[in-house]
């Protein structure tokens, strides 16, 4: 069936009746088919041929859900479907044993005996996630969208079937969706392995003779910049024109050299005005240039192009910006200004190279901004919903919720843009964080600041801080028990300007940079007064006094703003340290107005708030408990160490087996765990618990047939059923794990004497062996 807008094919020279004047042919309506069914090659077989808008990945998954979401299929059916599919093909079914959804993924042939891996889906009030993964998504479709771009815990990303990926319209996708489970065995399901054989061959480059180059025949020369794959506009052409001037012409056959005079402009065709030439697209202008001789690249050809931006626009701190202004400011140039004029091409080249280095970051930033502005994408829906929710009204723990949403959005953007951009992971994270701040925090900054100011004014925090500022300015350094002071306004004003920049910034990362610059100025002044040995004891009173003299009460709400919205990894570095110093100084100033507050120590409210903040923002420490650091000295390789995870309630026998496995001991029965304490070795019974061992001493894993062991056995025989070794450590309380890591010194020794073994242990400690005292 033909489309209404298409005409029938006629023999050469025949005229269609539809175009004869006065002839009216009765048009029969062409019914639009219910589905546009693509053929096996992915070409549309029916329907309108008009180009439609691009179908997003989320829309493809939503429409074709009956194909990949088979909740009634069992494990055998999933294996049968995925058996002939390429690696990465996926199905979602329902597990009969655990009564939850399962993601089945086809694995490569060389991955193992099983060609399908199953991953259980966990549903929680916060969303849905794969078992063992930390990424959580609102629904199943967004989860599949994310794993189409990233692997996370999967072996490889999830590709769409070829027919679904190449479908151009919603009707084609609906036709595929109508097949359901039968799609996998239909002719539409073409395998991706056939793609390399069907791909068209790349045409080989054809070399041209110098005569063809001189006459301008064939394809024109081109310049390609991999950093700007789609940007070959007039600005790039003008850049080359300014950098060097070479012309290839049909007038002379002399070697290429810079022309003495500017070349003439592009000739205008007869009957065409210059204004019409200016309105022509760049491709037609390029063709007209090639007809008279292609310039590589010429100068002043075609319409006038806008000049390149000066270095001042690229970098206002560049020392060459003043030279550009001086050379272009006056119409007449003196011999003194001629030297900067000759530097222009070099400076422009440096500017272009600098911009080229920054181009990938700008491309990533623009792509991330477009994704966040598009509500039809997963990250766009998340960001837009967040903006709407914050603007509606305040909620409890509002800043913490915004930080969690920013972390989720950054993970989704990293999965979307990571494989396509030439950026290392650490730079990609920084660029995405900056884009999120620009798209989310910049519009919400006035709202959040107003709510923080209202809350802190209601509970009296801002009033107490303002009163503390007044008392600190009145009492001077004596209010903090210090004699250091920045009395000169010349020294205080630079610090105040940095703090004002901090108040104007909307990004927590930028605010931390301004805070670090202000603290650097304070440390410089502190070293001038107190010497190079000045430390935190002198810095905190000086910071408090300078804050009082600057008189900026809004720093209180900015400190909370940064503490809650700053990226978690920055909280453990230098920025987190000085942010804590700022909070402590503000707490000291607020406590000056209270009679019960101590002048030289932070208030109890600060300690409580810092403890709650650390529990909320810093990584949890329960994951690092029950870890034992094991040191092992091999006579051939020397001292090595390993960290072993010992579950709670583990016995010495379990730990001995674990040590034998980790250190590949061939005779584990000949080794045992000993407690080295009070210049003696005490054999630990197998049934003893690891976490109830004393906190002092060394745990040594060594051979059991030692003189110390034999002597201990003799003493044990004499004393009957007494166990001096066990009594030595059972009397003490405590555990090895404590609040952090426990360390076990594991040592393998030969059949030396007891004194020799002690000396060897002391030598290990002197050589840096990681056998540390508990």
Swiss-Prot record:
S-S pairs: none
Phosphoserine modified-residue sites: 16, 209, 257, 330, 334, 351, 609
Record domain SH2: where: 68-162
Cellular location(s): Cytoplasm; Membrane; Cytoplasm, Cytoskeleton
Region annotation Disordered: where it falls in the sequence: 1-52, 188-211, 249-342, 704-774
Keywords of this entry: Acetylation, Cytoplasm, Cytoskeleton, Endocytosis, GTPase activation, Membrane, Methylation, Phosphoprotein, SH2 domain
Compositional bias of kind Basic and acidic residues: 704-766
Biased composition (Low complexity): 327-337
N-acetylmethionine: modified positions: 1
UniProt keyword annotation of Phosphoprotein present: yes
UniProt PTM: Phosphorylated on tyrosine residues by ABL1 and ABL2. Phosphorylation at Ser-351 by PRKD1 induces interaction with 14-3-3 proteins.
Any one biological process term the GO annotation gives: signal transduction
Domain Ras-associating, first and last residues per copy: 624-706
Modified sites of kind Phosphotyrosine: 35
Pfam families the UniProt entry points to: RIN1, VPS9
Omega-N-methylarginine, modified sites: 692
Record flagged with keyword Phosphoprotein: yes
Cellular-component GO terms for this entry: cytoplasm; cytoskeleton; cytosol; dendrite; endocytic vesicle; neuronal cell body; plasma membrane
Primary role: Ras effector protein, which may serve as an inhibitory modulator of neuronal plasticity in aversive memory formation. Can affect Ras signaling at different levels. First, by competing with RAF1 protein for binding to activated Ras. Second, by enhancing signaling from ABL1 and ABL2, which regulate cytoskeletal remodeling. Third, by activating RAB5A, possibly by functioning as a guanine nucleotide exchange factor (GEF) for RAB5A, by exchanging bound GDP for free GTP, and facilitating Ras-activated receptor endocytosis.
Subunit composition and interactions: Interacts with the GTP-bound form of Ras proteins (NRAS, HRAS and KRAS). This interaction prevents the association between RAF1 and Ras. Interacts with 14-3-3 proteins YWHAB, YWHAE and YWHAZ when phosphorylated on Ser-351. Interacts with the SH3 domain of ABL1 and ABL2. Interacts with RAB5A. The interaction with Ras is probably regulated and antagonized by the interaction with 14-3-3 proteins. The interaction with 14-3-3 proteins is regulated by phosphorylation on Ser-351.
Name of the protein this chain belongs to: Ras and Rab interactor 1
Lineage of the species this protein comes from: Eukaryota, Metazoa, Chordata, Craniata, Vertebrata
């Amino acid at each position: 069936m033909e489309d209404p807008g298409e005409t029938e094919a006629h023999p050469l020279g025949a005229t269609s009746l539809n175009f004869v004047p006065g002839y009216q042919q009765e048009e029969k309506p062409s019914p639009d088919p219910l589905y546009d069914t693509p053929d096996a090659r992915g070409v549309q077989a029916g329907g309108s041929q008009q180009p439609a808008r691009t179908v997003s990945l989320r829309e493809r998954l939503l429409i074709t859900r009956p194909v990949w979401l088979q909740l009634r299929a069992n494990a055998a059916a999933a294996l049968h479907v995925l058996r002939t599919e390429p690696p990465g093909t996926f199905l979602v079914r329902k597990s009969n044993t655990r009564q939850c959804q399962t993601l089945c993924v086809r694995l490569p042939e060389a991955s193992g005996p099983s060609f399908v891996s199953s991953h259980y889906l966990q549903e929680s009030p916060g969303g849905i996630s794969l078992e063992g993964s930390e990424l959580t998504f609102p629904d199943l479709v967004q989860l599949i969208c994310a794993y189409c771009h990233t692997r996370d815990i999967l072996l490889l990303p999830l590709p769409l079937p070829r027919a679904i990926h190449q479908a151009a319209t919603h009707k084609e996708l609906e036709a595929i969706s109508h097949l359901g489970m039968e799609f996998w065995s239909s002719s539409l399901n073409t395998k991706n392995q056939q793609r390399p054989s069907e791909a068209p061959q790349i045409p080989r480059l054809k070399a041209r003779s110098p005569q063809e180059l001189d006459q301008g025949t064939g394809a024109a020369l081109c310049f390609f910049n991999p950093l700007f794959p789609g940007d070959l506009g007039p600005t790039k052409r003008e850049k080359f024109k300014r950098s060097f001037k070479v012309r290839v012409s049909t007038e002379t056959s002399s070697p290429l050299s810079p022309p003495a005079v500017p070349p003439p402009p592009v000739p205008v065709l007869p009957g065409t005005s210059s204004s019409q030439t200016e309105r022509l697209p760049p491709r037609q202008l390029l063709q007209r240039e090639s007809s008279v001789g292609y310039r590589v690249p010429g100068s002043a050809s075609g319409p006038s192009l806008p000049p390149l931006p000066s270095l001042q626009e690229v970098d206002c701190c560049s020392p060459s910006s003043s030279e550009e202004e001086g050379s272009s400011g006056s119409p007449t140039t003196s011999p003194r200004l001629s030297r900067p004029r000759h530097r222009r091409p070099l400076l422009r080249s440096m500017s272009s190279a600098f911009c080229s280095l920054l181009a990938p970051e700008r491309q990533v930033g623009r792509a991330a901004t477009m994704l966040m502005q598009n509500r039809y994408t997963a990250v766009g829906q998340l960001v837009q919903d967040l903006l709407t929710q914050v603007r509606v009204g305040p909620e409890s723990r509002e800043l913490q919720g915004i930080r969690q949403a920013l972390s989720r959005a950054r993970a989704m953007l990293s999965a979307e843009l990571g494989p396509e951009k030439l950026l290392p992971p650490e730079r990609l994270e920084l660029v995405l964080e900056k884009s999120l701040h620009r798209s989310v925090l910049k519009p919400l900054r006035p709202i959040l600041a107003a709510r923080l100011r209202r809350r802190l004014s209601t509970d009296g925090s801002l009033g107490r801080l303002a009163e503390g500022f007044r008392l600190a300015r009145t009492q001077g350094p004596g209010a903090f028990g210090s004699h250091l002071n920045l009395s000169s306004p010349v020294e205080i004003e630079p610090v105040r300007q940095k703090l004002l920049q901090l108040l104007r910034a909307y990004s927590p990362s930028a605010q931390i940079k301004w805070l670090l610059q202000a603290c650097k100025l304070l440390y410089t002044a502190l070293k001038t007064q107190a010497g190079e040995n000045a430390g935190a004891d002198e810095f905190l009173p000086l910071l408090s006094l300078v804050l009082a003299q600057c008189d900026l009460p809004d720093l209180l709400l900015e400190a909370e703003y940064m503490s809650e919205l700053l990226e978690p990894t920055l909280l453990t570095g230098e920025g987190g340290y000085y942010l804590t110093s700022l909070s402590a100084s503000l707490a000291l100033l607020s406590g000056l107005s209270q009679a019960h507050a101590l002048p030289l120590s932070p208030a109890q409210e600060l300690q409580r708030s810092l403890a709650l903040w650390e529990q909320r923002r810093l990584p949890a420490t329960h994951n690092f408990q029950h870890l034992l650091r094991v040191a092992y000295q091999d006579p051939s390789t020397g001292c090595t160490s390993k960290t072993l995870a010992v579950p709670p309630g583990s016995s010495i026998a379990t730990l001995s087996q674990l040590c034998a496995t980790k250190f590949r001991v061939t005779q584990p029965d000949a080794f045992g765990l000993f407690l080295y304490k009070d210049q003696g070795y005490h054999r630990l019974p197998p049934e003893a618990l690891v976490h109830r061992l004393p906190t002092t001493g060394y745990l040594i894993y060594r051979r059991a047939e030692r003189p110390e062991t034999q002597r201990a056995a003799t003493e044990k025989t004499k004393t009957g059923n007494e166990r001096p070794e066990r009594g030595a450590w059972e009397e003490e309380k405590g555990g090895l794990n404590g609040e952090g890591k426990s360390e076990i010194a594991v040592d393998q020794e030969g059949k030396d004497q007891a004194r020799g073994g002690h000396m060897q242990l002391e030598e290990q400690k002197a050589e840096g062996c990681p056998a540390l005292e508990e």
